[in-house]
Amino acid sequence: MKKEFIDVINKLANKGKELGFYHLNMENESFDGKHLTVKGKEYIYFSSCSYMGLETNEKMKLAAIDAVQRYGTQFSSSRTSISLTLYEELEDLLGKIYGKPTYLAPTTSLGHISIIPTIMDTRDAIIMDQQVHNSVKNAVQMVKGDGVYTEILKHNKIDYLETRIQILKQSYDRVWYMCDSVYSIFGDTAPFKDITPLLDRYEQFHLYVDDAHGMSWAGKHGRGYVLNQMPFHEHMIVTSSLAKGFGSCGGALIFNDEAQKELIRNCSSSSIFSGPLQPAVLGASIASAKIHLSNEIETMQDELFERMFYFVQTAANHNIPIINNEMTPIFYVAIGKPEVGQKLSLFLQNEGYFSNYMVFPTVPMKNSGMRITLTRHHSLQDIQKLLERVAYGFEKIMKEENYSMEELYEDFSMIDPSKSNKVEPVIRLKVA
């Protein structure tokens, strides 16, 4: 990254800190998953990625305490040497959730660093979606330096992806497409119904999916969005995060067979040299996995889907411009002009709501917006009141800034949602 760009990011970050948007500290003496206290003011928290609300689950808290009582605060050894039996128990449970061999990494980011440099070499070509998570891009940079061919695909342009596969397969043994299942800013999803046929059509085509934001709220046993949309393919690797919907910490690496899993266990640098997860985390994760393997997770999924559907309906009723209605727990209110976004964020904070104000360079300059995430901790009334304040503040500030909805739609290449959006009933496909 060039120094000039670093300087721009640093300047914007410092400005955001001055305005009270970033690098804040929660002052709560305890946390219920919904209420925050920052600088003496209480907020309803609408930027958590703990979609299922499991971080406050009593079973998980008691399991974490029990693990600490039994094993201490840390078992300080590389897993190459020796690890707690809790690891084996958790990986076995994760394997039952996914129906495939699963390896546990300290984080999803370290999981990418485990897989990509170990499995891929100069016989491979890598195509990254433009919006794939930065942790994937960082791992790809490691192999790019070793001569692995990489390129960027415009976001979700699957027709062009097929063209690139046809060309690259003539020169490379494997052509990888790397994408997120659910994209963390706009909440949109990868078009797996269009990607799946390519895996069967082209022998050299392989798929690498980061399903961090799809875990728990979607799929049988909460196995995630991607495996709720398509069956596991032999030319596929899936990674996920236990730090979001799952309610604990760690990265799940899901493979087609045991040989791939053992290759990562034996040869990846982060597997050999990284420290282990703490006993408390492993204990809580085991409790969460047992919840996922019970009927309880289906009830939790239904509760979250009710909130997601209500959000989409209510936003449409208030003519709030939402980037997509794909029924994920991540929603992006299109604002466009940074000055409008800054004022709206401050307005919502003053009203007692905490969400993420997204601005350049995280999003394009004229694509600023409010990222709002839903969890089971929120009530329908919480959502209704938030969106009422968003609608009121949005209209008021747009007028103050002399910024029209027509300009906003042009900046986002959108059609007026009041004329085009149609809220359909939620249908959850279940893939065994």
Model-assigned labels for residue ranges:
Residues K2-Y71, F205:
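N-terminal "arm"/small-domain region of PLP-dependent enzymes with the aminotransferase-like
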Residues T73, T80-I82, E351-R371, M398-M405:
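Conserved PLP cofactor-binding pocket of PLP-dependent enzymes
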Residues T118-N134:
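Conserved PLP-anchoring active-site segment centered on the Schiff-base-forming lysine
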Residues E151-Y208:
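Active-site phosphate-binding strand-loop segment of PLP-dependent enzymes
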Residues L227-L263:
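Active-site PLP attachment segment
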Residues E298-F309, H318-E351, T362, K366, ...:
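Conserved PLP-binding catalytic core of the aspartate aminotransferase-like
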